[in-house]
A protein has these predicted regions:
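Short, Lys/Arg-rich flexible segments
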Residues: 1-82, 88, 97-143
Length: 143
């Protein structure tokens, strides 16, 4: 029994057109970068809110170190963005943000005071919606 497939050329044309709309004038990287940066903002805001509400906050160094990193590209993950304290941007001798987030069991154990994971859990749906809308607008700007 032969199988007749129709519309495959139209599908390929549509997919190619979507890719072209994401890469307007070779600026597709800028479109993806902007979408990721927009999606990172709600989580970053919540993270800063969580860090500022910690009753043990002393210097404000952790709060001030929370940043949205640059959009990077990797073969395995595609484009990605990081939000948090980036070790290379930490200006103090002692790097302690991870110990605040996870706690530690050293000679004087300290409990965890998470600020990163709760921010993601609280605002992830909002960020995913920003990504969906951004891609939808980039692919089909007439809707």
């Amino acid at each position: 029994m032969p199988l007749d497939v129709q519309g495959f050329d139209d599908l390929m044309t549509d997919i190619s057109g979507m890719a072209d709309r994401l890469d307007v004038n070779g600026a597709g990287a800028g479109v993806a970068r902007q979408i990721l940066e927009d999606a990172a903002r709600p989580i970053h805001q919540q993270m800063r809110s969580n860090a500022s509400q910690d009753p043990r906050r002393r210097s404000g160094d952790l709060y001030n170190a929370l940043k949205i990193g640059p959009v990077k590209r990797s073969q395995r993950c595609g484009k990605h963005i990081t939000i948090g304290v980036h070790r290379k941007d930490w200006s103090h001798e002692d790097y302690y943000p991870a110990y605040v987030e996870y706690g530690h069991g050293g000679p004087a154990p300290a409990p965890a005071h998470p600020y990163i994971r709760p921010a993601y859990d609280t605002r992830a749906d909002e960020s995913y919606e920003i990504i969906r809308e951004g891609l939808r607008d980039a692919i089909n700007p007439h809707n």
